[in-house]
Amino acid sequence: MIKKLFGLIALLSPYIIFSQNPLFIPDTLSGTAFNLNIQTGTVQFFPGQNTPTYGINGNFLAPTLFFNKNDTVTLNVTNNLIFPTTIHWHGLHIPPEFDGGPHQIISPTSTWSPRYRVMNDAGTYWYHPHGNGTTELHVTKGLAGIIIIRDSIESTLNLPRTYGVDDFPLIIQSRVFDIFYQIAGFTHEDSIMMVNGTIDPYLQVPEQMVRFRLLNGSVDRTYQFGLSNDSTFYQIATDGGLIEQPNAVNRLMLSPGERAEIIVDFSGLLGQTIYLMSYASELANGIMGSTDVSMGMATLPDYNNNPLNGADFNILEFNVK
């Protein structure tokens, strides 16, 4: 017990003392031909501590891809790792030979070039490995990115859509770091939150309507999203794209892999600080991230040691400027 408690303190203490960091906004790629290089990298999530990572066209995570509906796109995916992986286009309606599942291995040093027509409506999708038995490890180490599809209907709507100004991707993930600051997998002690690969992030937002594209990129944690001032926000899209009418809510639950687009109105809040939170205390038992998953703690090692489970916690700080 003492050993486990010491390990937990070691995991949490860097997070407690870690200073706030500006939210990283992934780079973008657009057009009809995309070159994606899967590679190793190194990131200092904690000052002076190098953490080995995986990334696409960078050290961690992947660029945001912009597709236009009905375009035919070619994606040249090169695997620079020393072991096989795959890339799956999560949520896209594409032929099975281009899906990127476990049956479509990209061997080390090789390039896979799927080519398909973009059939989905405007919305937020994502891409990540889907190898047999390796999906969790590869995603946890950093292989994940957003896909934004645009179409003629969405472009006519009065919505924020200036990327990185009033339209932000938020890849929300929980992670475990061991005492050597290395990313650990296959554990339920995921007590460190990241948004776009940033620990303890803040974002300066304009005093207006702002669009957020939420992706629950965690392995098995469900979030009950809400704002710290408990104000209403508006859901405008789900996994499948835009919904018919904005849905006014003050809570939004997303399971792993799910996406949603929301609009938050920061008008009249100049100078204020508001947090995007998860109200996990409100999750029903049986849901991953709740107090009790009702599966027997023996089947989920360390689940009941995780301080986030069943707790309300901050995810991202908004500073209205």
Task: Label every PLM stretch briefly.
Residues M1-Q20:
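Bacterial Sec-dependent N-terminal signal peptides
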Residues S19-E97, G101-S113, V165, Y181-F212, ...:
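N-terminal, post-signal-peptide metal-ligating segments of extracellular/periplasmic oxidoreductases
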Residues P26-T28, R150-F168, N305-G310, K321:
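Low-complexity, Pro/Ser/Thr- and charge-rich linker/hinge segments at domain boundaries
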Residues P47, F83-H90, K141, R221-S228, ...:
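Short, hydrophobic/aromatic beta-strand segments
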Residues F66, Y116-N120, V264-F266:
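Short, flexible loop/turn segments at beta-strand junctions in immunoglobulin-like
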Residues T78-N80, H130-T134, S267, Y279-S281:
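Beta-strand-rich extracellular modules
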Residues P114-N158:
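Hydrophobic or amphipathic alpha-helical targeting/insertion segments
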